[in-house]
Amino acid sequence: AICVSQAITYTDCTESGQNLCLCEGSNVCGKGNKCILGSNGKGNQCVTGEGTPNPESHNNGDFEEIPEEYLQ
């Protein structure tokens, strides 16, 4: 899965994978974690491993949405 837009900063999903994290969607994993895509785009997990870049975090949320213009 290709995670999108390095121009946007993201915070990290939890290492335990209890939070959803969409690659090729509205959210991406941070902190060098990678997404494991679930069925039907649901139940995605963020786990430790190479995959997404290490973007800077600027708040305490688990992830940030990509602005709609990136999703068209």
From Swiss-Prot:
One of its GO terms (cellular component) is extracellular region. Residues 47-72 are annotated as: Disordered. InterPro entries: Hirudin, Hirudin/antistatin, Prot_inh_hirudin. One of its GO terms (molecular function) is serine-type endopeptidase inhibitor activity. Residues 62-72 have a biased composition (Acidic residues). Residues 62-72 are annotated as: Interaction with fibrinogen-binding exosite of thrombin. Keywords: Disulfide bond, Glycoprotein, Protease inhibitor, Secreted, Serine protease inhibitor, Signal, Sulfation. Glycans are attached at residue 52. It is found in: Secreted. Hirudin is a potent thrombin-specific protease inhibitor. It forms a stable non-covalent complex with alpha-thrombin, thereby abolishing its ability to cleave fibrinogen. This is Hirudin variant-2. It comes from Hirudo medicinalis.
